[in-house]
């Protein structure tokens, strides 16, 4: 992909705060007109990376180009072309929704007639009429979110940076918010959004999973699920606690989660176990298909259960990518 087709390009991007490495040698190539997601736990480097990309903080090392501009050297030229929305509501709570939009239009130095047109369009697009003259501080989480998105897009930015924008809203508001994002990309806007919600990550055209400041997996959500290097096995039994205790003896087990009466297990595949005793069942069972391993182990323990392969989910990808080597299954 050529540089002209990329909205964001970064190489060797690193940020240190004293002895702490918050972002560690990240590389990014994000195409224009797409929604790209950062998925990761708190402290994984998502927010720090976004702040470097928009010029709010300088990298310790590495190179960044955003919309063809070199960061942070050309940050002033970038400001009018980028919208930024933080997790915390950052508009003025003592001003009404209408006054906030007018104030943001002045910050973006929009000409008066154009500002009036853009404000009217934002009011209609994001359904702000019902609370237009109420102080922003009195609005619900979903209403604040709609107002913040309207303000962030008032100047029609080419790139929209969203740092966990849906963390304080209800599921319906989140769903509506994402419909608005797809409408923006249909108009040519590129969007980079950080999240810790799996369903939101699945909506992205492309995705990077971050952990401890590094990108540990990247690709489309479908590709990441298809390429998961772990076997997914589901076990259903009357006594999940007994199953959990029995599976503790399976050295190939990488993760175990309970869903009602079902247990959802991630196992290292036979190829990853070759030449290593980690895939062997207690008592010398040896390697093999994950389903057969689990069935044999439960049979030896006298546990009646239904065991089957399951398709991987994005949560499985996330767990597999962020699970450190030798971590205790959970």
Positions of predicted regions on the chain:
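Conserved ABC ATPase "signature" region
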Residues: 102, 106, 113-131
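Conserved ABC ATPase signature
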Residues: 94, 135-139
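Conserved ABC transporter NBD signature motif
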Residues: 62-73, 77-78
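Catalytic Walker B motif of ABC-type/P-loop ATPase nucleotide-binding domains
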Residues: 160-163
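Short, charged/small-residue-rich alpha-helical element at the C-terminal edge
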Residues: 229-324, 330
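Conserved catalytic motifs of ABC-family nucleotide-binding domains
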Residues: 156
């Amino acid at each position: 992909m050529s540089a002209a087709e990329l909205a964001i390009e970064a190489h060797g991007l690193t940020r240190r705060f004293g002895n702490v490495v918050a972002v560690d040698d990240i590389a990014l190539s994000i195409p224009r007109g797409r929604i790209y997601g950062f998925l990761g736990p708190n402290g994984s480097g998502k927010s720090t990376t976004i702040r470097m990309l928009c010029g709010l903080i300088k990298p310790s090392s590495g190179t960044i180009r955003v919309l063809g501009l070199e960061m942070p050297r050309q940050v002033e030229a970038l400001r009018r072309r980028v919208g930024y929305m933080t997790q915390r509501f950052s508009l003025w709570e003592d001003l009404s929704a209408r006054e906030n939009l007018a104030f943001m239009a002045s910050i973006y130095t929009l000409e008066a007639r154009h500002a009036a047109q853009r404000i009217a369009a934002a009011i209609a697009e994001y359904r702000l009429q019902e609370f237009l003259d109420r102080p922003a501080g009195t609005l619900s989480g979903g209403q604040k979110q709609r107002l913040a998105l309207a303000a962030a897009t008032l100047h029609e930015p080419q790139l929209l940076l969203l740092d966990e924008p849906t963390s304080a809203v209800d599921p319906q508001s989140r769903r509506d918010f994402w419909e608005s994002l797809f409408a923006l990309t249909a108009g040519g806007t590129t969007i980079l959004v950080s999240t810790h919600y799996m369903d939101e990550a699945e909506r992205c055209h492309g995705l990077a999973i971050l952990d401890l400041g590094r990108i540990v997996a990247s690709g489309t959500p479908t590709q990441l699920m298809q390429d998961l290097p772990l076997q997914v096995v589901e076990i259903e039994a009357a006594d999940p606690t007994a199953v959990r205790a029995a599976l503790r003896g399976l050295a190939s087990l990488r993760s175990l989660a309970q869903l009602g009466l079902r247990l959802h297990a991630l196992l290292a595949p036979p190829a990853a176990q070759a030449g290593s005793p980690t895939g062997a069942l207690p008592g010398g069972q040896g390697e093999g298909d994950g389903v057969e391993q689990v069935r044999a182990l439960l049979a030896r323990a006298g546990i009646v259960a239904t065991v089957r392969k399951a398709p991987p989910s994005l949560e499985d990808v996330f767990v597999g990518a962020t699970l450190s080597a030798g971590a205790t299954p959970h």
